[in-house]
UniProtKB/Swiss-Prot annotation:
Gene behind the chain: trhO
Protein name: tRNA uridine(34) hydroxylase
Catalytic activity: uridine(34) in tRNA + AH2 + O2 = 5-hydroxyuridine(34) in tRNA + A + H2O
GO molecular function, one term: oxidoreductase activity, acting on paired donors, with incorporation or reduction of molecular oxygen
A biological process from GO: tRNA modification
UniProt cross-references to InterPro entries, sorted A to Z: Rhodanese-like_dom (IPR001763), Rhodanese-like_dom_sf (IPR036873), Rhodanese_C (IPR022111), TrhO (IPR020936), TRHO_N (IPR040503)
Source organism of the structure: Hamiltonella defensa subsp. Acyrthosiphon pisum (strain 5AT)
Coiled-coil zones: none
Lineage: Bacteria, Pseudomonadati, Pseudomonadota, Gammaproteobacteria, Enterobacterales
UniProt keyword list: Oxidoreductase, tRNA processing
Catalytic residues of the enzyme: 200
Enzyme Commission code(s) on record: 1.14.-.-
Enzyme category, top tier: oxidoreductase
Length: 355
């Protein structure tokens, strides 16, 4: 019986990936379709893709598949054959290739069976996910931009919106998609008759969100086909005006793809223009935040003086401090508000020391 999961440490896998000389293609895809036996489907795909040295993150559920992966160029055709033949619903499925790609997006294949391919928190049994809004292609998106009766709604997390978005798009400020859905309905409830243009990274979230808004009585709901990735690729290919500014945030080692030259975000520590996402170097924190090169040097890659101080302790001292702290300080959050709270506490503590 073959081993259908990884048994090697992340560090060794990452080192192995960085030492690779073969070229890779980063891509993403999703498909909503009925799947009777997700576990069996998962094991079949894992066996095939592991042999092809595919890396990445794949979620499989009774409602379909959602994947962000990297594939060796030499195995790309074999991978496509495997995917297209895996299920009739996946034949010739659109693959969103990365806008910027250094081939270092993933270093291990993780394939999981889940209840949903995107965590939506929807428990209403009358909800029909197949009743979705109308697709918009790139040129149609640009026409809709001109329509004063159309509202563009960003169906991504707030930290994704922060570094890049469609001009004048509405931000639904949340950390998760499940929080965002009811929040969007509440925020937009006075505009149910207007045209709602939903978008996300690759299309999976805005497709389900379009069905959710229709379920809640919105009349004219659209979503960008293929998400930001397909819109940008098509607009550049056809020399169309590009109305997305900044970076497209991605959930892999790259953390972002440059779309336009504008830098619209700010360093969370000094407020200088910056759109580089990093994780705090203190492994007990690992906060996702925006940090410029100057602050990275000043804080040793940490989100605050607290984490910087902890990082400089011996491993045993770090363990004791974390044990004493317990779960009282919540720092595992992608929210700038949480970061500001940590930084303010650092300033207060420093002031007390100086006093």
């Amino acid at each position: 019986m073959p081993v259908l999961h990884n048994r090697i440490s992340n560090q060794k896998l990452k080192e192995k990936m960085l030492a690779e000389t073969q070229e890779r293609q980063t891509l993403s895809f999703y498909k909503y379709f009925a799947l009777d036996n997700p576990s069996m489907f998962r094991d079949k795909l894992y066996t095939q893709w592991n042999q092809l040295s595919v890396f990445g993150r794949v979620y499989i559920a009774k409602e379909g598949i959602n994947a962000q992966i990297s594939v060796p160029i030499d195995h790309y055709n074999d991978f496509k054959a495997s995917l297209f033949n895996a299920h009739p619903a996946l034949d010739q499925i659109r693959l969103n290739t990365a806008l910027e790609d250094n081939g270092r997006s993933f270093w291990v294949l993780r394939m999981k069976v889940r209840q949903r391919i995107v965590a939506d928190g929807i428990e209403d049994e009358t909800f029909n996910p197949a009743h979705t809004g109308q697709y918009l292609k790139a040129h149609e998106v640009n026409e809709m931009i001109k329509d004063p009766d159309a509202l563009f709604v960003d169906m991504r997390n707030h930290y994704e919106y922060e570094v890049g978005h469609f001009k004048n798009a509405i931000k639904v400020p949340s950390d998760t998609f499940r929080e965002q859905l009811p929040m969007a309905v509440d925020m937009l409830k006075e505009d149910k008759e207007k045209k709602m243009v939903l978008y996300c990274t690759g299309g999976i979230r805005c497709e389900k969100a379009s069905a959710y808004l229709l379920h809640h009585g919105f009349k004219n709901v659209y979503h960008v086909e293929g998400g930001i990735i397909e819109y940008v690729r098509t607009a550049k290919k056809k020399d169309l005006p590009l109305h997305f500014i900044g970076k497209n945030f991605v959930f892999d080692e790259r953390m972002g793809e440059r779309v336009s030259e504008e830098v619209i975000a700010h360093c969370h520590q000094c407020e200088q223009f910056c759109d580089t996402h990093v994780n705090c170097h203190n492994s007990a924190c690992h906060l996702l935040f925006i940090q410029c090169a100057i602050c990275s040097e000043k804080f040793s890659g940490c989100c605050s003086a607290i984490c910087q101080e902890e990082l400089e302790l011996s491993p045993e001292e770090q363990r004791l401090r974390r044990s004493a702290r317990g779960n009282k300080i919540k720092i595992f959050n992608k929210s700038k508000d949480v970061l500001e709270t940590i930084m303010n506490k650092s300033i207060i503590d420093q002031g007390n020391k100086e006093g």
